[in-house]
Amino acid sequence: MSFFQLLMKRKELIPLVVFMTVAAGGASSFAVYSLWKTDVILDRKKNPEPWETVDPTVPQKLITINQQWKPIEELQNVQRVTK
């Protein structure tokens, strides 16, 4: 008995199959979308410390209210010493 014959015999399974197919498709498309975003880093060999390339003058949050972004002197000194 094939899958479609089973669905035609038990019609109450059709909505379940449709919802599961849509959910699996949505989850798969979101996973692929997440991999192509620039926030996700998969190649750690080229840039093992990606947080050092973040510009401190650019806010990284969705909402920033009255916040000043300043470089931290101690971190700047550590970066200069390690490079």
From Swiss-Prot:
Biological-process GO terms, alphabetical: response to bacterium
Superkingdom as given in the UniProt entry: Eukaryota
Subcellular location: Nucleus
Alphabetized UniProt keyword annotations: Nucleus
Tissue and organ expression note: Expressed mainly in stomach, placenta, small intestine and colon, as well as in normal mucosa of esophagus. Down-regulated in esophageal squamous cell carcinoma.
A single GO cellular-component term on record: nucleus
Disulfide bond residue pairs: none
Pfam family, one: B12D
InterPro entries: B12D
Major location (coarse): nucleus
Family in the record: Belongs to the complex I NDUFA4 subunit family.
Name of protein: Normal mucosa of esophagus-specific gene 1 protein
